[in-house]
Amino acid sequence: MKKFFIIGTNTEVGKTYISTKLIEVCEHQNIKSLCLKPVASGQSQFSELCEDVESILNAYKHKFTAAEINLISFNQAVAPHIIAAKTKVDISIENLKQFIEDKYNQDLDILFIEGAGGLLTPYSDHTTQLDLIKALQIPVLLVSAIKVGCINHTLLTINELNRHNIKLAGWIANCNDSNIKYIDEQINTIEELSGYKCSAKISRNADYLDFIDLSKILI
């Protein structure tokens, strides 16, 4: 079983969009996948579920339950450690790790774990998402929304991954804003300064077919 932890350079960079398209291409190719969203925030306007959890379940056509893919949910779209403190919820690294590792014995080809926001998103006053990734020791798939500031955010994230000896399986350029100029130049700069080639350049309104080459790299 291949395992990948999907993080963004920031929040709202398209992690869940990328996750759902990877799910769709796996389903299309009869690749047995499971995408977890261990920590989620921001309730959907259409149900009691968090929006990201609902999107993942929809991509699977509800063959999984919310409890199978999500451990901790908050209705408010607020940084996890803040809303956890307000609601007296303990976001335990050990509990999250156990929730994820419990899936390792399932008959899967690939396991995706979609994180909450960026690499250093706090889970508490003394832990961050990085601590969970280090505990799991699995490669990271990084999503960067190409726009002003993305070069700095992407390089900082890659540098931090390297500093902690966490493998970067690849990075995806999410080019979802057609108004952004010099997209290729920004991608080229990230490639040159980081030493990592872009694994996939995803344009606005892409469908799962645009992810087939990426799925081949991952699997």
Curated annotation (Swiss-Prot):
It catalyses: (7R,8S)-7,8-diammoniononanoate + CO2 + ATP = (4R,5S)-dethiobiotin + ADP + phosphate + 3 H(+). Its EC number is 6.3.3.3. Pathway: Cofactor biosynthesis; biotin biosynthesis; biotin from 7,8-diaminononanoate: step 1/2. Mg(2+) binds at T16, D52, E114. Keywords: ATP-binding, Biotin biosynthesis, Cytoplasm, Ligase, Magnesium, Metal-binding, Nucleotide-binding. The keyword Cytoplasm applies. ATP binds at E12, V13, G14, K15, T16, Y17, D52, E114, G115, A116, G117, N174, C175. It is found in: Cytoplasm. GO terms for cellular component: cytosol. One of its GO terms (biological process) is biotin biosynthetic process. It comes from the Bacteria. Substrate binds at S41. GO terms for molecular function: ATP binding; dethiobiotin synthase activity; magnesium ion binding. Belongs to the dethiobiotin synthetase family. HAMAP family: BioD (MF_00336). Catalyzes a mechanistically unusual reaction, the ATP-dependent insertion of CO2 between the N7 and N8 nitrogen atoms of 7,8-diaminopelargonic acid (DAPA, also called 7,8-diammoniononanoate) to form a ureido ring. This is ATP-dependent dethiobiotin synthetase BioD. It comes from Francisella tularensis subsp. holarctica (strain LVS).
